[in-house]
Swiss-Prot record:
Entries under Pfam families matching the protein: Lectin_C
Family: Belongs to the alpha-type phospholipase A2 inhibitor family.
Compartment(s) where it occurs, according to its Swiss-Prot or TrEMBL record: Secreted
Name of this chain's protein: Phospholipase A2 inhibitor CgMIP-II
Tissue expression: Expressed by the liver.
Keyword field: Disulfide bond, Glycoprotein, Lectin, Phospholipase A2 inhibitor, Secreted, Signal
Stretches assigned to the C-type lectin domain: 46-161
InterPro entries to which the protein is assigned, alphabetical: C-type_lectin-like, C-type_lectin-like/link_sf, C-type_lectin_CS, CTDL_fold
Glycan attachment points: 122
Organism: Cerrophidion godmani
Bridged cysteine pairs (disulfide): 83-160, 138-152
PROSITE patterns linked to this entry: C_TYPE_LECTIN_1, C_TYPE_LECTIN_2
């Protein structure tokens, strides 16, 4: 944006130095300069709003991950598409505070939701007797954040995980 502004000013200076003061060209340059200044202001406002939301959402959890539900339910098979269309992923808490933030969403809705547990997970929160493939090959978290083996065909609360890396 600054390059556009500087180019416009350079062009304006060239017109003035050549004595070529065409009103329409000067008005066009002034309009461009004004438009760039408005864009810079709008960008600053948008960045401030985004940072405010980010800080508010991550304040309570201390996490750069945010867990959000659309209040719908889905089987595991459709969950990745739902989350990816929203710009997120299936939840995969890697730390206790992330699992707590995820569980807070489940508690508010009083429903369980699917999550993904990686093979190299440093953090797990399995309930007693789990994992147990007899219950299913998917994983769900209950309203307390405990993980249970589950059928992938259960309709559970849609919760997606979003990363804030700024």
């Amino acid at each position: 944006m600054r390059l556009i502004l500087l180019s416009g000013l350079l062009l304006l200076g060239t017109f003035l130095a050549n004595g070529d003061e065409k009103d329409s060209e000067i008005q066009l340059l002034n309009s461009m300069i004004e438009a760039v200044m408005i864009l810079q202001r709008d960008f600053s406002n948008l960045r401030y709003a985004l940072m405010t939301v980010h800080n508010a959402r991550s304040f309570g959890s201390g996490s750069e991950r945010v867990y959000v539900s659309n209040k719908e339910v889905s089987k595991f098979e459709g969950l990745e598409e739902i989350c990816s269309q929203a710009g997120g992923h299936i939840p995969s808490p890697q730390l206790e505070n992330q699992n707590k933030a995820f569980a807070d969403v489940l508690e508010r809705h009083n429903k369980a939701a699917y999550l993904v547990v990686g093979d190299s997970a440093n953090f797990t929160n399995w309930a007693a007797g789990h994992p147990n493939e007899a219950d299913g090959t998917c994983v769900k978290a209950d309203t307390h954040g405990s993980w249970h083996s589950a059928s992938c065909d259960d309709n559970l609360l849609v919760v997606c995980e979003f990363y804030f890396i700024l």
